[in-house]
C-alpha cells in the first residue's frame, strides 16, 4: 500500500492520530497508530489504534460499541501525523462517557470541566 510507505512513523513505529467528528468538526480524541493499525483502518474503514500501555491493537468501540466509521483520512505536510474524520457511533468518543476526550479547559491556572458526561462509564463498560 503506497500510503503506508509514504507515512512517516517514529522510531517506535508509531504515528499520532487526531480524530475529528466529520459532521461538526469537533476534535474527539488523540491516539497512536502503528503501521498495522493504520492499514486495518484503511482496509476496514473503521478506526483501529495501537495501545501503548497494553502493547496491542485497539479496535475503537470493541467494548463500548462506540466505533468510529472512517469518512476521510488526511496526513499533515510532513506525513507524520494522521487526521481521521469519522462518524462517531453513539456520539461518545471518550472512555469517561463524554463526546470528546477534550473536555477540560484551562481557566486561569486550573483545568475546568466544560462538558457533561453523556453516559456513565460503568454503564458503558459492564
Curated annotation (Swiss-Prot):
Give the Enzyme Commission number: 3.5.4.19
Which Pfam families does the record associate with it?
PRA-CH
Where is this protein localized, as stated in its record? Cytoplasm
According to the record, the segments passing through the membrane are none
Read off the InterPro entries from this record.
PRA-CH, PRib_AMP_CycHydrolase_dom, PRib_AMP_CycHydrolase_sf
Gene Ontology CC entries for this record: cytoplasm
Alphabetically list the UniProt keywords.
Amino-acid biosynthesis, Cytoplasm, Histidine biosynthesis, Hydrolase, Magnesium, Metal-binding, Zinc
Q: Where does Zn(2+) bind?
A: 77, 94, 101
Q: Tell me which Gene Ontology terms the entry assigns under biological process.
A: L-histidine biosynthetic process
> What pathway does this protein act in?
Amino-acid biosynthesis; L-histidine biosynthesis; L-histidine from 5-phospho-alpha-D-ribose 1-diphosphate: step 3/9
User: Which reaction is the catalytic activity of this chain?
Assistant: 1-(5-phospho-beta-D-ribosyl)-5'-AMP + H2O = 1-(5-phospho-beta-D-ribosyl)-5-[(5-phospho-beta-D-ribosylamino)methylideneamino]imidazole-4-carboxamide
Q: How does it assemble?
A: Homodimer.
Q: Which NCBIfam families has this protein been placed in?
A: PRK00051.1
Function statement: Catalyzes the hydrolysis of the adenine ring of phosphoribosyl-AMP.
Q: What is this protein called?
A: Phosphoribosyl-AMP cyclohydrolase
This chain's source organism reads: Ruthia magnifica subsp. Calyptogena magnifica
Give the gene that encodes this protein: hisI
Amino acid at each position: 500500500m503506497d500510503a503506508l510507505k509514504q507515512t512517516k512513523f517514529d522510531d517506535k513505529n508509531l504515528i499520532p492520530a487526531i480524530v475529528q467528528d466529520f459532521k461538526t468538526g469537533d476534535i474527539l480524541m488523540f491516539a497512536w497508530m502503528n503501521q498495522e493499525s493504520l492499514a486495518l483502518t484503511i482496509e476496514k474503514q473503521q478506526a483501529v489504534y495501537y495501545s501503548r500501555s497494553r502493547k496491542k491493537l485497539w479496535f475503537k468501540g470493541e467494548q463500548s460499541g462506540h466505533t468510529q466509521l472512517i469518512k476521510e483520512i488526511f496526513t499533515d505536510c510532513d506525513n507524520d501525523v494522521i487526521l481521521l474524520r469519522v462518524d462517531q457511533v453513539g456520539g461518545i468518543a471518550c472512555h469517561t462517557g463524554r463526546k470528546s476526550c477534550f473536555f477540560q479547559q484551562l481557566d486561569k491556572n486550573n483545568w475546568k470541566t466544560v462538558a457533561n458526561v453523556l453516559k456513565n462509564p460503568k454503564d458503558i463498560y459492564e
